Amino acid sequence: MIYLAEGCFWGVEEYFSQVDGVLDAVSGYANGRGDTTNYQLIHQTGHAETVEVTYDANRISLKELLLHFFRIIDPTSLNKQGNDRGSQYRTGIYYTDKADLAIIDEVFKEKAKDYKKKIVVEKAPLKHFIKAEEYHQDYLKKNPNGYCHIDINQATYPVIDESKYPKPSATEIKAKLSADEYRVTQKNETEKAFSNRYWDSFDAGIYVDVVTGEPLFSSKDKFESGCGWPSFSRPISPDVVRYKEDKSFNMTRTEVRSRSGNSHLGHVFTDGPKDQGGLRYCINSLSITFIPKADMEAKGYGYLLSSVE
């Protein structure tokens, strides 16, 4: 088990109940003053709204759970998540097994690189966990339109561990890439439309960063847009891309870059299929490498097969 405080527990409980490998998620109160409290008293007793997550370690690792944790919080916000304010809404990771601390520290170290501000998430042994009142359990299942400060739909996206796909040195990148790949990924240039390798390819598989191998897109989300470049309705996971305002060529666009490699990928536009979210990720073929579904297991991407099927 691991105990996660991430603001209002209604959405957090529902989110983790949808994560593959999680066996149970229970709302409660943790690490306050004393081993008794209730919803009306937690602002006085110092407890944090917390979810007890029971998981199958053969299906999901603690690190993967913690990456889910960081996906849905602002770790630099003290005593505030979403619209909720107060010490009961602080973020925290509370553990019962000392061996978990090394994994928690590893994730903290990795995530600290993503933020300019200091991470203020508590990490501490669990002192006590008090199960919340019954009306709080499965709250959003009982009240589908109830308040929720997080995007629960993100629970279905795979968690991709950035540390598995480190960025090579500048020298290594230059040696690895072709001249055209280097020009596009490192110099932010654009390849020609309708004459690139993936614009009209729709075989089953995934597309990874040509620099790092980090998974970026799935063939399941690829569509024919008529623009002459590979087009996707979404990334394989919201975690693997970064966005940047691009004002080149007297236009204002949103550039898409890869997370680990910081490679220029292309741009995202709002003229995509409405039934798939309305976005069009227009991506340079030179920025990505296709991994056929049949090769995914052998190349270490077997954990993403469900994102293709």
UniProtKB/Swiss-Prot annotation:
Location of the MsrB domain: 170-293
Coiled-coil residue windows: none
Any GO BP: protein repair
Entry keyword set: Multifunctional enzyme, Oxidoreductase
Class of the enzyme per the UniProt entry, highest EC level: oxidoreductase
Catalytic activity line of the entry: L-methionyl-[protein] + [thioredoxin]-disulfide + H2O = L-methionyl-(S)-S-oxide-[protein] + [thioredoxin]-dithiol; [thioredoxin]-disulfide + L-methionine + H2O = L-methionine (S)-S-oxide + [thioredoxin]-dithiol; L-methionyl-[protein] + [thioredoxin]-disulfide + H2O = L-methionyl-(R)-S-oxide-[protein] + [thioredoxin]-dithiol
Keyword Oxidoreductase: yes
One Pfam family it belongs to: PMSR
Enzyme Commission number: 1.8.4.11, 1.8.4.12
A GO cellular component annotation in the UniProt record: cytoplasm
Top-rank taxon: Bacteria
Keyword Oxidoreductase attributed: yes
Main function: Has an important function as a repair enzyme for proteins that have been inactivated by oxidation. Catalyzes the reversible oxidation-reduction of methionine sulfoxide in proteins to methionine.
Family: In the N-terminal section; belongs to the MsrA Met sulfoxide reductase family. In the C-terminal section; belongs to the MsrB Met sulfoxide reductase family.
Protein's recorded name: Peptide methionine sulfoxide reductase MsrA/MsrB
Organism: Streptococcus pyogenes serotype M3 (strain ATCC BAA-595 / MGAS315)
